[in-house]
């Protein structure tokens, strides 16, 4: 009876360790291509915008034994005045060649036509190779855009692998 109880407890401990989430934190810099706005004529400064950006991790983290490297994000925003509701995807690459996809959404602000920062939540929506079955998510927060249009984003969260 004691051996069976010990085996059950050991199995539960191994299962809990295997599914435990690992904290991650990093910093990403993105530079966007010119946006594609479509005005909505119901009120001033109302539009839908699609933006594509190339991004590099300036403070990378590791997942599955490899370091995050770079990626591309595609953002769809509904702008109303100086605020926007953002939704998008980030397709990222690892130094070892595996890839991952992130879905995100949040709110951004602008001032004088330039990004004044944004924040929101994100979650992994896929992965390849060692990242197959990747799960997790977290929050992000961006600083106002630099003079050259580069946006720096702090990303924090957690992940787990099967």
Task: State what each model feature region is.
Residues 10-11, 43:
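Extended interaction regions within the primary functional domain
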Residues 1-7:
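Bacterial N-terminal signal peptides that target proteins for export
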Residues 11-19:
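Hydrophobic h-region of N-terminal signal peptides that target proteins for export
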Residues 20-162:
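Beta-strand-enriched cores of mature, soluble protein domains
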């Amino acid at each position: 009876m004691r051996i069976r109880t010990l085996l059950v407890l050991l199995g539960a401990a191994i299962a809990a360790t295997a599914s435990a989430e690992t904290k991650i934190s990093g910093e990403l810099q993105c530079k966007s291509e010119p946006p594609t706005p479509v005005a909505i004529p119901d009120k001033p400064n109302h539009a839908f915008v699609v933006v594509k950006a190339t991004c590099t991790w300036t403070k990378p983290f590791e997942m599955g034994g490899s370091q995050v490297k770079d990626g591309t994000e595609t953002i769809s925003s509904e702008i109303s005045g100086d605020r926007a509701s953002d939704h998008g995807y980030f397709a990222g690459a690892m130094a070892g060649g595996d890839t991952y996809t992130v879905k995100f959404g949040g709110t951004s602000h602008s001032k004088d036509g330039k990004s004044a920062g944004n924040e929101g939540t994100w979650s992994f929506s896929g992965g390849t190779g060692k990242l197959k079955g990747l799960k997790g998510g977290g929050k992000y927060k961006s600083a106002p855009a630099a003079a050259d249009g580069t946006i720096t984003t702090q990303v924090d969260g957690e992940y787990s692998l099967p």
